């Protein structure tokens, strides 16, 4: 105890105590942690083999892994084992595959024209197997055909199918021939002498205005219809009078109400 007391008293009077303590802390911080086994090796103890607890761990790791790899995919059926009751071994397929022609058929539904209290209905079935874009193109084509009926008579058109599609042409109509019964001592009027009113398509007709400030209305069938087919498609016929044909054209062009207010029709 006396020696320990003397050491403590000496350290208290030691002027470089703080520096020595700092150097000791720095050395301890740089010192790597080592296992007892490694410390024994540094001390010069000759250890040719690792301790038993290290060997046991290494042996278990090296033996378990190859065993798992060797057992994968090496199932060998036991030929001498008893067969399972109810199991029938089927013969293996040993024939060669042959090419077989496959034909995809579809039931085409024909267009149907129906009549009911609301009028006539035409039903067109959509072709099978169309993609979304093809379906849209098909619908637009049908719509275009329907809208074209405003400008010509579809029933009078010719239909031609080609490799690229369909061609519809306006049929050139021949003038309608009607029998005229002559009347004695009378002179036929211009409308009676004309076999087809469309022959007067370039002849203008004048309607007088109801007000003096307006100019007379002069118009012809050629200005109201682009062709005889268009004239026929909206209800015209060759036996109409010239005036009736002009009035039909005004109604077709939606000008009749305006003309009726301003002119004597």
Swiss-Prot record:
Function: Nonenzymatic cofactor regulating the function and conformation of the RNA polymerase and part of the transcription and replication complex. Binds the viral ribonucleocapsid and positions the L polymerase on the template. Acts as a chaperone for newly synthesized free N protein, so-called N(0). Plays a role in virion assembly.
Phosphoserine PTM sites in chain numbering: 60, 64, 226-227, 233
Residue ranges, annotated region (Interaction with the Nucleoprotein-RNA and template-binding): 245-265
Keyword vocabulary terms for this entry: Chaperone, Host cytoplasm, Phosphoprotein, Viral RNA replication, Virion
Organism: Vesicular stomatitis Indiana virus (strain 94GUB Central America) (VSIV)
Residue numbers spanned by region Interaction with the L polymerase: 49-105
Protein's recorded name: Phosphoprotein
GO molecular function: RNA-directed RNA polymerase activity
Compartmental location: Virion; Host cytoplasm
Region of interest (Disordered), residue spans: 28-69
Post-translational modification remark: Phosphorylated in the N-terminus by host CK2. Phosphorylation of the phosphoprotein is required for the transcriptional function of the P-L complex.
Marked site (Involved in oligomerization) residue numbers: 138, 141
Gene3D superfamilies: 6.10.140.830, Vesicular stomatitis virus phosphoprotein C-terminal domain
Phosphoprotein is among the record's keywords: yes
Residues with PTM Phosphothreonine: 62
Interaction with N(0) as annotated region, ranges: 1-60
Single GO cellular component term: virion component
Sequence similarity: Belongs to the vesiculovirus protein P family.
Keyword Chaperone part of the UniProt annotation: yes
The protein's assembly and partners: Homodimer. Interacts with the L polymerase; the association of P and L forms the polymerase complex and positions P optimally for encapsidation of newly synthesized genomes with the nucleoprotein. Interacts (via N-terminus) with N(0). Interacts (via C-terminus) with N in ribonucleocapsid (via C-terminus); this interaction allows to package the L polymerase in the virion and positions the polymerase on the template, since P acts as a bridge between N and L.
One Pfam family per UniProt: Phosphoprotein
